[in-house]
Amino acid sequence: MELTPREKDKLLIFTAALLAERRRARGLKLNYPEAVALITAAIMEGARDGRTVAELMHEGTTVLAREDVMDGVAEMIPEIQVEATFPDGTKLVTVHHPIV
């Protein structure tokens, strides 16, 4: 199977998000890479489902709460930008203050 660099990046994000989901389900607080991966994957999947950029900008702020992440992680992520594939093409989704 041949994958493009972009497809490899998507799989890496998905794998990291899956690990983050499992750790969160076990009651562990997420670190920086896990938090970013989980929010990014939610945005990418929402785009694939056909949601709008505006919907995903809002949804990105509801994926994690401060209680879900280690101390200081929320402050380390002032925004997340995701280049997501929508049914009508690729668009940039920016989520400001994703962890509140």
UniProtKB/Swiss-Prot annotation:
Compartments where found: Cytoplasm
GO cellular component: cytoplasm
BP GO annotations: urea catabolic process
Catalysed transformations (reactions): urea + 2 H2O + H(+) = hydrogencarbonate + 2 NH4(+)
Keywords from the named record: Cytoplasm, Hydrolase
Coiled-coil annotated spans: none
Tagged with keyword Flavoprotein: no
Family recorded in the similarity comment: Belongs to the urease gamma subunit family.
UniProt protein name: Urease subunit gamma
